[in-house]
Amino acid sequence: MDKKQTRLRRARKTRARIAELKMVRLSVHRTNSHIYAQIIDETGNKVLASASSLEADVRSAMANGGNVAAAAVIGKRIAEKAKAAGIEQVAFDRSGFKYHGRMKALADAAREHGLVF
């Protein structure tokens, strides 16, 4: 197995565990250039809130959407949008990525602004 397949296998296992818990999940995806976060309902069928470094106001404020600072901004935005939608507690789905760097920055910012996970 190569690196990507290993990451995707980890992601499937994590999502299966979250599905058993029947919890709303905070799903995060990253690329070299951008970071994306979505709040997905218990069934996995509906996106309740989303934020990404591609949004116009984030893009104008940040020169680079693929760094730790951008991840922290996205964490703050997703927490604000989730609270506006009435969501306080989520399960963190890091999509198989290591909890380090941008993932950690996004998670810490989301926790600071009120999300519980």
Swiss-Prot record:
The keyword Plastid is annotated on this UniProt entry: no
Lineage: superkingdom: Bacteria
Coiled-coil ranges per UniProt: none
One annotated GO biological process: translation
MF terms in GO: 5S rRNA binding; structural constituent of ribosome
Keywords from the named record: Ribonucleoprotein, Ribosomal protein, RNA-binding, rRNA-binding
Gene Ontology CC: one annotated term: cytosolic large ribosomal subunit
Function summary: This is one of the proteins that bind and probably mediate the attachment of the 5S RNA into the large ribosomal subunit, where it forms part of the central protuberance.
UniProt record similarity statement: Belongs to the universal ribosomal protein uL18 family.
Family matches, as HAMAP family: Ribosomal_uL18_B (MF_01337_B)
Assembly behavior: Part of the 50S ribosomal subunit; part of the 5S rRNA/L5/L18/L25 subcomplex. Contacts the 5S and 23S rRNAs.
Name this polypeptide is given: Large ribosomal subunit protein uL18
